[in-house]
Amino acid sequence: MRVKRGLASHRRHKKYLDAAKGFRGGRSKLYRTAREAVERSWMYAFRDRKVKKREFRKLWILRINAGARMHGLSYSKFMHGLTLAGISLNRKVLADLAVREKEDFAKLAQLAASKLN
């Protein structure tokens, strides 16, 4: 009996063309270029999920450093003072405090400075 494979390949093509919706030109219309574009976009997405973590950590450190320097401490001295004080807040929370809750961050900076001396 003759086996017709149109349905399987159609579904496979449709999967890539649906994923390429919103791409410009042939990248959303032609199967081969759409597949290449989609696979490349998946590579970028995988890579940038890793980069995102690094970028946010850099941003948090930058904000904590700015907040600490307003109280006469460097970032490293501030973090060391917090460790000596037994305070284990992560950088995300500390950065949020430095931006939104300046009074609370000032208390933490004061505590860190007192533990350093």
Curated annotation (Swiss-Prot):
Keyword Ribonucleoprotein included in the entry's annotation: yes
Record GO cellular component, one term: ribonucleoprotein complex
GO BP of this protein: ribosomal large subunit assembly; translation
Gene3D superfamilies, sorted: 6.10.160.10, Ribosomal protein L20
Alphabetized GO MF terms: rRNA binding; structural constituent of ribosome
Family note: Belongs to the bacterial ribosomal protein bL20 family.
Role according to the record: Binds directly to 23S ribosomal RNA and is necessary for the in vitro assembly process of the 50S ribosomal subunit. It is not involved in the protein synthesizing functions of that subunit.
Protein name as it appears in the record: Large ribosomal subunit protein bL20
Gene: rplT
